[in-house]
Swiss-Prot record:
Originating organism: Pediococcus pentosaceus (strain ATCC 25745 / CCUG 21536 / LMG 10740 / 183-1w)
Lineage of the organism: Bacteria, Bacillati, Bacillota, Bacilli, Lactobacillales
Protein name per UniProt: Small ribosomal subunit protein uS14A
Pfam families: Ribosomal_S14
Gene Ontology, cellular component aspect: cytoplasm; small ribosomal subunit
Presence of the UniProt keyword Ribonucleoprotein in the record: yes
Subunit (UniProt): Part of the 30S ribosomal subunit. Contacts proteins S3 and S10.
Encoding gene (name): rpsN
Length: 89
């Protein structure tokens, strides 16, 4: 489980990125890099870090499912992820 402060920080960064997304797109299209550099640091999407949606774990994140490998494995064994089953060959 990630620290609550880290999870909240990531959520704030996501909100900031969403708030400035359109403005950033316009500034980039106009090649106004000076104004772009005046925007907040956290307005850049590269500052975001993918985290597990269940417990906030930052490592071993699986994009397709939005969770870490540990939670994916647990939920898959419990049969709570539709269409996922243990491989057997």
């Amino acid at each position: 489980m990630a620290k609550t402060s880290k999870i909240i920080k990531e959520q704030k960064i996501e909100e900031t990125v969403a708030r400035y997304a359109e403005l950033r797109r316009e500034l980039k299209a106009n090649k106004d890099y000076r104004a772009l550099s005046q925007l907040p640091r956290n307005a850049s999407p590269t500052r975001m870090h993918r985290r597990d949606s269940l417990d906030g774990r930052p490592h071993a994140y699986m994009r397709k499912f939005g969770m870490s490998r540990l939670n994916f494995r647990r939920l898959a064994h419990e049969g709570q992820i539709p269409g996922v089953r243990k491989a057997s060959w």
